[in-house]
Amino acid sequence: MKTTKSGSRVMAAVLTAAALGVLAQGTAHAEQYQSGATRWDIKGGKLMMVAGVLDDNSRLHYLNYAFYVQASDNALYLAPIVDDPKKLNDYRLNFSTFNGGGEILTDAVVAVKGASTYLVTAHKDAVHGYNRPAAVTTRTYRLVEGDEAQWRWYFAPVAQGAYSEQQNYTVERALAETAKALH
């Protein structure tokens, strides 16, 4: 096959682009959100999630999600995740994702449905190893505006879900279906 000088340049550009695409795919992670800030318009202001990489190597990938509400007065409030609304002193200031062996094992998604804002978390129990069928559990929290005696904003639990090993759910599918069913 005979190629011209410009044809060689085009071929080199195509091969370089393909190689960069393969490299980018190899380092991509499939969490719902990437490192950085994501914002949603919510009742009472804006919800901001800041995602930062905790650890990143060829096998394991963690992201740390922290949530803030920018109120209508422009004040920025940290929005913790509480496991029991009656015990607001039992809280987490962040949520960590986990991607192991190329599979998401723990992740979360934010869903804004009308005046309500939800955080849905999902975890796959990988006791039999990565990329194998396992039970997936979900937990749904609603963003609540507190008063002076509480957190100004916080995520309170409203529901739990479970998908059996036989259903062979992924974390992504459990998150998508749970978020879609919210009202």
Task: Give residue ranges: language-model regions.
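A general, composition-driven signal for non-globular sequence regions
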Residues: T3, A19, D84-K86
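Intrinsically disordered, glycine/charged-rich N-terminal periplasmic/extracytoplasmic linker segments
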Residues: K2-T4, V22-G26
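Residues in flexible loops and secondary-structure boundaries
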Residues: R9, V22-L23, K113
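Bacterial N-terminal signal peptides
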Residues: A12-V22
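Exposed acidic/polar residues on beta-strands and adjacent loops within beta-sheet cores, strongest
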Residues: G26-H183
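Bacterial N-terminal signal peptides that target proteins for export
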Residues: K2-V14
